[in-house]
């Protein structure tokens, strides 16, 4: 069972909210931090992208008449808040962590510089990439894909509420069928909403595998990182 050298972990903003639908649950963040810390302690280099949907969603705001660009910028700032929360939890465990923001805010986070990010990873620091791509109209899934490609990660670890990719939402349809593996093209052609089309296409074009797994099962981040077969592989 071979593990990975470097992973990019994609967490939704909702993952930090715990049982709530909004905000940040400190206990949940600490629990996630412990799992990520265990992976880093095993020698695997870890980059993280956190969404911002527990605080603000630009797309939803645009649907309610707010300017889409303004909404997306607000969503990017929400990811910075989440990134700082996760960073704080990790630092309190003694894990060296760096938050790197695509939007410069020097008092809060380092500016994102690719070579510096790679150097942090090589030194064993966890790097949390904040503020998306800094551009509106791009999701944090796309930001995760971009950062994974830039740092030459071996895989994108997409943590979700379900244990893989299904032909339809298993939380709504008990008869949903799980795919142990699936191609990028089939994800796109079926319109499966595991990640947005831009990020799937980028992974396809660059042959970057995605593993979709259940974040709510304790230990799954480590299992996935060590190469254990869990969830669904998109390749």
UniProtKB/Swiss-Prot annotation:
ATP binds at residues 10-13, 53, 57, 160, 166, 169. One of its GO terms (cellular component) is cytoplasm. Its main location: cytoplasm. Pathway: Pyrimidine metabolism; CTP biosynthesis via de novo pathway; UDP from UMP (UMPK route): step 1/1. One of its GO terms (molecular function) is UMP kinase activity. One of its GO terms (biological process) is UDP biosynthetic process. SUPFAM superfamilies: Carbamate kinase-like. Keywords: ATP-binding, Cytoplasm, Kinase, Nucleotide-binding, Pyrimidine biosynthesis, Transferase. The keyword Kinase applies. The keyword Cytoplasm applies. InterPro entries: AceGlu_kinase-like_sf, Asp/Glu/Uridylate_kinase, Uridylate_kinase, Uridylate_kinase_bac. UMP binds at residues 52, 72, 133-140. Inhibited by UTP. HAMAP family: PyrH_B (MF_01220_B). Catalyzes the reversible phosphorylation of UMP to UDP. Belongs to the UMP kinase family. Homohexamer. This is Uridylate kinase. It comes from Solibacter usitatus (strain Ellin6076). The gene is pyrH.
């Amino acid at each position: 069972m071979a593990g990975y050298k470097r992973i990019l972990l994609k967490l939704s903003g909702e993952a930090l909210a715990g049982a709530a639908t909004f905000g940040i649950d400190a206990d949940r963040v600490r629990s996630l931090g412990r799992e990520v810390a265990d992976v880093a302690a095993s020698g695997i280099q870890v980059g993280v992208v956190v969404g911002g949907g527990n605080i603000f969603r630009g797309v939803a705001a645009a649907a309610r008449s707010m300017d889409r660009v303004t909404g997306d910028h607000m969503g990017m700032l929400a990811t910075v808040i989440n990134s700082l929360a996760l960073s704080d939890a990790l630092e309190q465990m003694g894990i060296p962590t760096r938050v790197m923001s695509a939007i410069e805010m020097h008092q809060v986070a380092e500016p994102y510089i690719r070579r510096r990010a790679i150097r942090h990873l090589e030194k064993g620091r966890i790097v949390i990439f904040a503020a998306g791509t800094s551009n509106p109209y791009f999701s944090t899934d796309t930001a995760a894909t971009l950062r994974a490609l830039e740092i030459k990660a071996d895989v994108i670890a997409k943590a979700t509420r379900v244990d893989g990719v299904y032909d339809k939402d298993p939380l709504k349809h008990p008869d949903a069928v799980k795919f142990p593996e699936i191609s990028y093209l089939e994800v796109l052609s079926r319109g499966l909403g595991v990640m947005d089309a831009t990020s799937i296409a980028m992974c396809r074009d660059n042959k970057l595998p995605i593993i979709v797994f259940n974040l709510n099962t304790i230990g799954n981040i480590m299992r996935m990182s060590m190469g254990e077969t869990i969830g669904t592989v998109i390749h």
